[in-house]
Protein backbone atom coordinates (compact mmCIF):
# COMPACT_ATOMS: atom_id res chain seq x y z
CA UNK A 1 0.00 0.00 0.00
CA UNK A 2 1.39 3.40 -1.02
CA UNK A 3 0.89 6.08 1.63
CA UNK A 4 0.83 9.67 0.38
CA UNK A 5 1.31 12.63 2.69
CA UNK A 6 0.14 16.13 1.82
CA UNK A 7 0.50 19.19 4.01
CA UNK A 8 -1.02 22.63 4.21
CA UNK A 9 -2.79 25.26 6.24
CA UNK A 10 -6.18 24.72 4.55
CA UNK A 11 -7.57 28.01 5.82
CA UNK A 12 -10.74 28.99 3.95
CA UNK A 13 -11.09 25.84 1.85
CA UNK A 14 -11.24 26.58 -1.86
CA UNK A 15 -11.12 24.77 -5.24
CA UNK A 16 -7.30 24.89 -5.28
CA UNK A 17 -7.22 22.85 -2.06
CA UNK A 18 -9.66 20.28 -3.47
CA UNK A 19 -7.61 19.97 -6.67
CA UNK A 20 -4.39 19.55 -4.65
CA UNK A 21 -5.89 16.82 -2.46
CA UNK A 22 -7.45 14.96 -5.41
CA UNK A 23 -4.13 15.02 -7.27
CA UNK A 24 -2.25 13.89 -4.15
CA UNK A 25 -4.70 11.01 -3.64
CA UNK A 26 -4.02 9.76 -7.17
CA UNK A 27 -0.38 9.18 -6.23
CA UNK A 28 -1.17 6.28 -3.91
CA UNK A 29 -3.62 4.14 -1.99
CA UNK A 30 -3.94 6.21 1.19
CA UNK A 31 -3.84 9.98 1.68
CA UNK A 32 -2.80 11.36 5.05
CA UNK A 33 -3.04 15.13 5.31
CA UNK A 34 -1.03 17.11 7.83
CA UNK A 35 -2.83 20.33 8.72
CA UNK A 36 -0.51 23.07 9.96
CA UNK A 37 -0.89 24.24 13.54
CA UNK A 38 -1.99 27.85 14.02
CA UNK A 39 1.49 28.73 15.31
CA UNK A 40 3.20 27.12 12.30
CA UNK A 41 0.84 28.80 9.84
CA UNK A 42 1.49 32.17 11.45
CA UNK A 43 5.26 31.62 11.32
CA UNK A 44 5.38 30.59 7.65
CA UNK A 45 2.32 32.20 6.00
CA UNK A 46 -0.31 34.14 7.93
CA UNK A 47 -2.50 33.97 11.02
CA UNK A 48 -5.29 31.57 10.05
CA UNK A 49 -8.87 32.78 10.11
CA UNK A 50 -10.17 29.30 10.91
CA UNK A 51 -8.85 27.63 14.12
CA UNK A 52 -6.64 24.55 13.68
CA UNK A 53 -9.14 22.07 15.13
CA UNK A 54 -11.85 23.25 12.73
CA UNK A 55 -9.44 23.07 9.80
CA UNK A 56 -8.43 19.48 10.58
CA UNK A 57 -12.11 18.48 10.95
CA UNK A 58 -13.00 20.05 7.58
CA UNK A 59 -10.07 18.39 5.81
CA UNK A 60 -10.95 15.04 7.43
CA UNK A 61 -14.42 15.25 5.89
CA UNK A 62 -13.15 15.65 2.32
CA UNK A 63 -13.62 12.69 -0.01
CA UNK A 64 -9.99 12.13 -1.11
CA UNK A 65 -8.65 12.26 2.48
CA UNK A 66 -8.25 9.02 4.43
CA UNK A 67 -6.94 10.70 7.56
CA UNK A 68 -6.08 14.25 8.63
CA UNK A 69 -3.85 15.10 11.56
CA UNK A 70 -2.48 18.26 13.11
CA UNK A 71 1.20 18.88 12.52
CA UNK A 72 3.76 19.14 15.28
CA UNK A 73 4.65 22.38 17.00
CA UNK A 74 8.25 23.38 16.37
CA UNK A 75 9.86 20.67 14.21
CA UNK A 76 7.61 20.40 11.16
CA UNK A 77 9.48 17.26 10.02
CA UNK A 78 8.89 15.23 13.20
CA UNK A 79 5.54 14.04 11.80
CA UNK A 80 7.46 11.99 9.22
CA UNK A 81 8.36 9.51 11.98
CA UNK A 82 4.67 8.91 12.68
CA UNK A 83 3.22 8.88 9.16
CA UNK A 84 6.18 7.28 7.34
CA UNK A 85 4.98 8.29 3.86
CA UNK A 86 6.03 6.62 0.62
CA UNK A 87 5.22 9.82 -1.28
CA UNK A 88 5.06 13.46 -0.21
CA UNK A 89 2.88 15.63 -2.44
CA UNK A 90 3.86 19.30 -2.48
CA UNK A 91 1.61 22.00 -3.86
CA UNK A 92 2.91 24.20 -6.65
CA UNK A 93 3.10 27.19 -4.29
CA UNK A 94 4.37 25.51 -1.14
CA UNK A 95 7.70 26.99 -0.10
CA UNK A 96 9.20 23.68 1.03
CA UNK A 97 12.68 23.07 -0.38
CA UNK A 98 12.40 19.66 -2.06
CA UNK A 99 16.05 18.82 -1.34
CA UNK A 100 15.60 19.57 2.37
CA UNK A 101 12.42 17.46 2.54
CA UNK A 102 14.25 14.60 0.78
CA UNK A 103 17.19 14.92 3.22
CA UNK A 104 14.85 14.86 6.23
CA UNK A 105 13.23 11.68 4.88
CA UNK A 106 16.61 10.01 4.27
CA UNK A 107 17.79 10.98 7.75
CA UNK A 108 14.81 9.03 9.08
CA UNK A 109 15.47 6.03 6.82
CA UNK A 110 12.49 6.76 4.58
CA UNK A 111 12.87 6.20 0.82
CA UNK A 112 10.15 8.77 0.20
CA UNK A 113 9.45 10.15 -3.26
CA UNK A 114 8.77 13.91 -3.42
CA UNK A 115 6.26 15.07 -6.05
CA UNK A 116 5.55 18.72 -6.86
CA UNK A 117 1.96 18.94 -8.11
CA UNK A 118 0.86 21.35 -10.86
CA UNK A 119 -1.05 24.56 -10.32
CA UNK A 120 -4.84 24.57 -10.33
CA UNK A 121 -6.07 26.81 -13.11
CA UNK A 122 -9.19 28.41 -11.77
CA UNK A 123 -10.68 31.35 -9.96
CA UNK A 124 -10.42 31.74 -6.18
CA UNK A 125 -7.57 29.25 -5.97
CA UNK A 126 -5.94 30.84 -2.93
CA UNK A 127 -6.91 32.05 0.52
CA UNK A 128 -5.45 35.50 -0.11
CA UNK A 129 -7.51 35.79 -3.31
CA UNK A 130 -10.66 34.96 -1.37
CA UNK A 131 -9.84 37.51 1.34
CA UNK A 132 -9.09 40.14 -1.31
CA UNK A 133 -12.36 39.38 -3.13
CA UNK A 134 -14.36 39.64 0.11
CA UNK A 135 -12.62 42.95 0.87
CA UNK A 136 -13.48 44.28 -2.59
CA UNK A 137 -17.09 43.15 -2.18
CA UNK A 138 -17.43 44.82 1.23
CA UNK A 139 -15.86 48.05 -0.05
CA UNK A 140 -18.26 48.07 -3.00
CA UNK A 141 -21.25 47.45 -0.72
CA UNK A 142 -20.10 50.23 1.62
CA UNK A 143 -19.82 52.64 -1.32
CA UNK A 144 -23.29 51.67 -2.54
CA UNK A 145 -24.71 52.13 0.96
CA UNK A 146 -23.29 55.66 1.12
CA UNK A 147 -24.70 56.53 -2.30
CA UNK A 148 -28.10 55.06 -1.44
CA UNK A 149 -28.12 56.56 2.06
CA UNK A 150 -28.15 53.17 3.84
CA UNK A 151 -26.24 52.76 7.07
CA UNK A 152 -26.11 49.83 9.46
CA UNK A 153 -28.10 47.53 7.18
CA UNK A 154 -27.03 44.22 5.75
CA UNK A 155 -25.40 44.72 2.32
CA UNK A 156 -28.07 45.45 -0.30
CA UNK A 157 -30.72 44.72 2.31
CA UNK A 158 -29.95 40.97 2.18
CA UNK A 159 -29.94 38.86 5.30
CA UNK A 160 -26.48 37.52 6.17
Per-segment meaning from a language model:
Residues 1-160:
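Nucleotidyltransferase catalytic core that binds NTPs
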Amino acid sequence: MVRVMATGVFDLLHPGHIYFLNEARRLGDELVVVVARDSTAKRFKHQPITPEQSRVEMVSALKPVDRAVLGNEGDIFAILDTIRPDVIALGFDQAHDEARVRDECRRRGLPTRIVRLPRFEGDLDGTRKIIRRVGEYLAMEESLAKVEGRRGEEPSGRAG
